[in-house]
Amino acid sequence: MNPSYNEREVLALLQEESTQKRGFEMIVAQYSEQLYWQIRRMVLSHEDANDLLQNTFVKAWLNIDYFRAEAKLSTWLYRIALNECLTFLNKQRAASTVSLDAPAADTLQKLESDPYFSGDKAQMALQKALLTLPEKQRMVFNLKYYQEMKYEQMSDIFGTSVGALKASYHHAVKKIEKILGEED
């Protein structure tokens, strides 16, 4: 279990150049695991998730002086991770010019052969269903279902209304229910 730090304490450490590194180490210790799993649910590959997590923390470190405490630190980190995932997925899609189904098929193949995937058949079926969702719906579903994140915090991350996020989650759930119902 990762240590839990008071956000004000960490922010105070980040303000001083002499303690900035220690403050950032606390951020990494606090948020690495939950950010990893959020990223992993989007890209599914352990190696890609690790790379994107590292990129997220590098960008956070390089831009820590620009962090405004108007939002929570976790919201800011999730936003960076979300942008990293979107950039990665867009590059993957652009590189795959064979067909529109190829990226999903490739991702599904990676999931099925991933030695780090420890889920059962139900979890595998859910992950396959998630692959059929548009990226934003998948991200909203992951944040709500797995992270139990409040819509208000998601609104800060996505820069969209709570109502739109609720609708996106509802549509995602309906699509997943339909897909899982067809597999029975």
Task: Show where each model-derived region lies.
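Internal acidic/polar
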Residues: P3-E9, A95-G119
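Structural recognition of an alpha-helix C-terminal capping motif at a helix-to-coil junction
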Residues: W37, D51-V58, A71-N83
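Arg/Lys-rich amphipathic alpha helix in sigma70-family domain 2
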Residues: Y66-R68, R79-S99, H171
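Sigma70-family region 2
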Residues: E16, L44, F57-K72, Q92
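N-terminal module of bacterial RNA polymerase sigma factors
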Residues: M1-Q34, E182
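A short pre-motif secondary-structure segment
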Residues: V140-K144
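C-terminal edge and immediately downstream basic/flexible tail or linker adjoining helix-turn-helix-like DNA-binding
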Residues: N2-Y5, T97-S99, A125-Q127, E152-S161, ...
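Amphipathic, Lys/Arg- and hydrophobic-enriched alpha-helical face
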Residues: V28-H46, N63, L130, K175, ...
